[in-house]
Design a protein with these regions (language model features):
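N-terminal hydrophobic/helix-forming segments and targeting peptides
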Residues: 1-138, 142-144
Length: 146
């Protein structure tokens, strides 16, 4: 059970924003290949694998079972990079705004991944124009890294 739990944690830590699940799919294919299970990827990016059937002591075949799971995660899309390295992001999925403050995130870019932290502006310091905008602030150590 510990290995199953760790495998699940490892999969959940792989970035897989909706529409960008290739890293998760590659990890699943690699894990299955390591135990000799052939896989294929369909045109939508789904990983498909088949396991040999089993029979009981009386020779009765077990029923076929399909396991289906999402590979994607909730996340953000970068809408603007400010001169000081601040990223303005828009939520992708049903993330509750109140739950995001001070959360550690991974910003995935063409040249690699960078750690970031979601920050929010105090309500009394937010201008009326900013209150209606559906993005959150995210900052990285320097704008050079962005």
């Amino acid at each position: 059970m510990d290995r199953l739990r760790q495998d699940l944690i490892d999969l959940m830590l792989i970035p897989g924003l909706s529409g960008h699940e290739t890293r998760v799919a590659a990890a699943i294919r690699a894990s299955l290949a390591a135990i000799g299970v052939p896989t294929r990827t369909d045109r939508l990016g789904n990983v498909v694998a088949s396991f040999a059937g089993v029979t009981d002591a009386l020779g009765t075949a077990a029923p076929a079972v399909m396991v289906f799971a999402h590979m994607d995660q909730l996340g953000f899309v970068v809408r603007k990079i400010e001169a000081d390295g601040l990223l303005r992001v828009e939520r992708l999925g049903g993330l509750a705004e109140r739950a995001m403050a001070a959360q550690a995130v991974l910003v995935c870019g063409r040249d690699g991944d960078l750690p970031g932290v979601i920050m929010t502006k105090a309500h009394h310091a937010t201008t009326p124009d900013e209150k209606s905008v559906s993005y959150t602030h995210l900052t990285l150590p320097t704008n050079r890294e962005v």
